[in-house]
Swiss-Prot record:
SUPFAM superfamilies: DNA/RNA polymerases (SSF56672), Lesion bypass DNA polymerase (Y-family), little finger domain (SSF100879). It comes from Staphylococcus aureus (strain Newman). Belongs to the DNA polymerase type-Y family. GO terms for molecular function: damaged DNA binding; DNA-directed DNA polymerase activity; magnesium ion binding. This is DNA polymerase IV. The record marks F15 as: Substrate discrimination. NCBIfam families: PRK02406.1, PRK14133.1. The gene is dinB. Keywords: Cytoplasm, DNA damage, DNA repair, DNA replication, DNA-binding, DNA-directed DNA polymerase, Magnesium, Metal-binding, Mutator protein, Nucleotidyltransferase, Transferase. Its main location: cytoplasm.
Length: 356
């Protein structure tokens, strides 16, 4: 039986990072997302600069203001977060259909079928993080292991912008020394019960019998018993049927030079063709999307009689669509090429290994 390989990707301070990307003046500042300092809401996300003051998620905004009076308080922009999340999930699905999103900014990926001797799971995780950085200008942390529990644990161990691998060689040492509050799923209430019963770290948990843990925590006790031993048989659950494949790029500065933009369209067409070939699919619609310097999103789609899958065919259609969309007086900050209405190709295509 092939050993499973699971990646857990967790975006770093996602909401705050999106705000800092879209407003460079916020970069390096203590950014607190959730609302005005005077509001009755709670903190959604705080940048690492704000966390140094003790600000954290779910904290009342009023308390965050007391701790960090010079912080930059930003109202949540869920439209931008959802749009960026969709980009990130699309990147995940360009590698595998076995993707289980847990929220806008984190997901599990089962990449067991992609791993081979010269392409370990850690390298695939690096490629995914690189794609996220190039396409969204955001950093992500990754955990790699042989089950979901350990992959999630690993993703939080080297933040921000880091990666940790937990394997059979290091799992015991990591779990035994882990603070009980750092076990995924152990909240404040559970932590108090743990402490009241002499459980302060993974070793203490490991030394409890399954019966003792069930007595303390009910059905959850069996799960805690398994976690102390690094056991988790849960599957990566994905019910999504792929409907489209695409790639977007945000320019470092706003651009209105056709030659530069079309070079990017060619690059995106190639990336999209690679992903189609990996899936052994072809497409009957092509869409080009642009976002102007004023953050206005425009798109145009063409439906085709015959399906396409090659870089040249996708580019030729994208070229026509871009020319219909463009306004020479309006610089753009983002361009994307997406193909949809997918169908199975009638010939053997290349695989991911031809493109990595």
């Amino acid at each position: 039986m092939t050993e499973r390989r699971i990646i857990h990707i967790d975006m770093d301070y996602f909401f705050a990072q999106v705000e800092m990307r879209d407003n460079p003046k916020l970069k390096g500042k203590p950014v607190i997302v959730g609302g005005k300092a005077s509001s009755r809401g709670v903190v959604s996300t705080a940048s690492y600069e704000a966390r140094k003051y003790g600000v954290h998620s779910a904290m009342p905004m009023s308390q965050a203001h007391k701790l960090c009076p010079n912080g930059y308080f930003v109202t949540s922009n869920f439209g931008a977060y959802r749009e960026t999340s969709a980009q990130i999930m699309s990147i995940f699905r360009s590698y595998t259909d076995k993707v289980e999103p847990m929220s806008l900014d984190e997901a599990y990926l089962d990449i067991t079928e992609l791993v081979r001797p010269d392409l370990p799971a850690s390298k695939i995780a690096q490629y995914i993080r690189k794609d996220i950085l190039e396409q969204t200008h955001l950093t992500a942390s990754a955990g790699v292991s042989y089950n979901k529990f350990l992959a999630k644990l690993a993703s939080g161990m080297n933040k921000p912008d880091g990666m940790t691998v937990i394997d059979y060689q290091n799992v015991h040492d990591i779990l035994m020394t882990l603070d009980i509050g750092d076990f995924p799923g152990v909240g404040k209430a559970s932590k108090k019960v743990m402490h009241d019963n002499g459980i302060f770290n993974g070793r203490d948990l490991y030394e409890k019998t399954e019966f003792e843990l069930i007595r303390l925590f009910g059905k959850r006790g069996r799960g805690l018993y398994n976690k102390a031993r690094g056991i988790d048989h849960s599957e990566v659950k994905s019910s999504r049927v792929r409907k489209s494949v695409g790639t977007e790029r945000t320019f470092a500065t706003d651009v209105n030079d056709d030659e530069e933009i079309l070079r990017k369209v060619w690059e995106l067409s190639g990336k999209t063709a690679e992903r189609l070939n990996k899936l052994q699919k072809s497409a009957k619609t092509v869409t080009v999307k642009i976002k102007t310097y004023q953050f206005e999103t425009l798109s145009k789609q063409m439906s085709l009689r015959d399906s396409v899958s090659s870089e040249e065919d996708i580019y030729n259609i994208a070229y026509l669509l871009y020319n219909d969309l463009k306004d020479p007086d309006v610089p753009i900050r983002l361009i994307g090429v997406t193909v949809g209405n997918l169908e199975q190709s009638t010939y053997k295509n290349m695989t991911i290994y031809d493109f990595i």
